[in-house]
Structures are given as structure tokens and as C-alpha cells.
Amino acid sequence: DDVESRGLGDVYKRQDHIGAEVITTFDLRMTSPNEEPVMNTAEVHTIEHLGATFLRNHPEYKDKTVYFGPMGCRTGFYLLLAGDLSSKDIVPLMVEMFEFIRDYKGEVPGASPKDCGNYLDMNLGMANYLAKRYLDNVLYNIDDSRLVYPE
């Protein structure tokens, strides 16, 4: 079942400058907007926790990660990184992150009343499934047509 997702979109939807630093916003579209069902909040929330944990601990990107979180429409995620980066620059990072999410077992990091305002809204099984789907249908065979944001 092929996904008409835009993949990584135009990896930088935009770039913003904060002082001398460039912040690049990446559009990680996991479902095809207005064509297929959106992701449920529980799996989106789980992917957010796992993705943020992965990025905060990544040897190369932990100091470049500004934000990772869901789109309000629940079709994907935004990743904000410090630096003038292209979509091709982050494909290996996205593969690594979504493999981490696909393979993750155990307690979801930060899923406790002390750390999260909605810690019961988690679905690890669906997060694993959606990460695998994104890897198989988008990231593993990504080409230039999925790395440029459609006009």
C-alpha cells in the first residue's frame, strides 16, 4: 500500500535567523494530507516522546535540535534544527530515528505523571507500526521528488 506522502517535504519549509544562527524547519509528512486518515493522538504522542529522546541523545544532532513535535493536523511532525541544512543532510538522521522508534520496546521515556501532562495517552504498538510504514514507504527509497516541497 503505497503512501502518497510528500516524504520529508521541502525539508526546509523555511529558514529563520536568530542572531547569527540559522534555524531550518523540516516537514516530516507521515500521511497524505486530506487523502488518508490522520494519526491518532496516542501514537503521535508516543512518536513525539521517542523522537525527542532520540534527538536529545544523538551524538551529532543533540546540540542542533531545537524542537521535534507533531503538526496540529496529525499528518506528521516538524523538526527544527540549528544550521543551514538541506533535506538530503537529514535523511540518514531520519532513518536512524525512525528505526529507533520502530524497534523501541519497554516504557516510553517521559510517560509518567511527573514528566508529562497526558502520560496515559500513549500507543507504542501503533508508533512502532507507523515508524515502520514511514521507513518502508518513504525513507528507505527516498528520491529527489520527495525532498522538494511542492509549490
Where do the PLM segments sit?
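Active-site-adjacent, His/Asp/Glu-enriched structural segments that form or flank metal-binding
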Residues: 68-140
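Short, small-residue-biased leader/transition segments that mark boundaries at the very start
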Residues: 2-12
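Generic alpha-helical propensity signal that fires on short helical segments
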Residues: 44-48, 62, 95-99
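Short, ordered beta-strand-loop transition motifs
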Residues: 12-22, 70-73
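Generic recognition of long tandem-repeat/solenoid scaffolds
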Residues: 17-30, 77-79
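Active/ligand-binding-proximal structured segments within catalytic/core domains
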Residues: 23-57, 67-68
